[in-house]
Amino acid sequence: LIRRHCIALGLLAALAGFFPALAAQPGSRSPTVLVVGDSLSAEYGLKRGTGWVALMERRMAQEKIAAQVINASISGDTTSGGRSRLVALLKQHKPNLVIIELGANDALRGLPLPMTQDNLQAMTLAAQESGAKVLLIGMQMPPNYGQDYGARFAALYATVAKVNKAALVPFLLKDVADGPDSARLFQNDRIHPNEAAHPLILNNVWPAVKKLIA
């Protein structure tokens, strides 16, 4: 009996060596995705679990992608606020992917565009230096901000992404703010997308996320 037990153990060990993917990897863990955003990612005015970040987590489960999602988004946050708390978040969660969705509140408050770009640059660099990949989520301003301002605001995301070779989603609210059904996709404040809009938002983000964590 002892001899049979030893033979069985030896066979299992041999199989584990022959099929390394089946063997446990010491110290391995599921990838962590850290989302640092504002109210557009923090489920402002929504029923809990209906925002695009929660929907992304469910999509991962459906597609059998074992990843942990940390949503560190805060309503009203600016790029300065995100920058000030990112280092601590990186140390705490050690993410494999950092999604940065900030900047809209900078524009709403009339903050200088160079400052917004500098903050996004610093956040991207800090995340990359920690070993994480970065996905920048861009925003666009309504026409009443002026064509020149809108173009410069949108361009800063592309600039930061290009300089740092980071991934980019050019416009989080594509097909939401600029679609034919935009009137029914916003809350009463006409600023924040409603529950019906968030599956569309996820459609904008998911292809890039999947590529980065696959």
Residue spans of the language-model regions?
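A detector of low-complexity, intrinsically disordered, Ser/Thr/Gly/Pro/Ala-rich segments
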Residues: R3-H5, S30, N96
